[in-house]
Amino acid sequence: MDKTIPIEFANSVDLAIIAFYFVSVIGIGLYFSKYIKGAGDYFRAGNKMHWWVAAISSWMSGFGAFVFTGLAGMIYLEGLQAALLTTTGLPAMIFAYFFFAKYWRRSRVMSILEYFGIRFNKVSLQISTWFYIPIYVLIMSAGLYSLSFFVGTALHFPVETVILVAGISIAIYTVIGGIWGVVITDTVQFLVLLPVSILMIPLSIHAVGGMDALVAQAPSGFWRPFSGEIPNAMVTIPFFLAYMLQIIHGQNTNPIAQRFFSVRNEREAQ
């Protein structure tokens, strides 16, 4: 039976809520700008950040519209083996707890690039800086595009328009509010996203006819990861291991490491 759910585009109330959200995040950046008295406040919050705020921000920094679009699509096509990609943050956090967190906090630098300059030399600092710039332009562009594609589809707006509005809003609260503007905005997003995501679980299961229907209608190999039953699967064991290494690296270097620099002591970094 075809259970396709028709798409209902946003109405005026939805648009008003979204507009309020954009105004709010810009307001957060403006509000926390008053706490910035120097570079230490701007880049590492003057080492006054509470661990739980830093933790939420770290998690949210790796969470975007891709989870609801690209990753959800991969799980739909490839089953549990694609869903296991979401577990790769666990080894990253284990490495952070036992090694990276306390040593990054102990370094007392404002960025990893600054650490390169202190630990090695200015040449290392310059090379690393110019190496990071194009990489993070691509990473941020991909994240902004996935966000804009998702929002543009829901609002029935051109993707280019959403990219422009979202990009400018993000730039404003980031540049004005510094690390405080970023982490508080991340925390607000978390408080909005968590209940909605939890609510989506029973609604999604109900939409497919219950758990029994979900299990019964899944294609062969959907619940058996890496069994070879999924044709042309992208998520293979080598892919999974490479992805896990990338997450371990990404969660313990720029820009996530800024949270380690910003908390009050090594214990809170852990």
List each language-model region with its residue ranges.
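Membrane-water interface of alpha-helical transmembrane segments
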Residues: T4-L15, G40, R44-N47, G79, ...
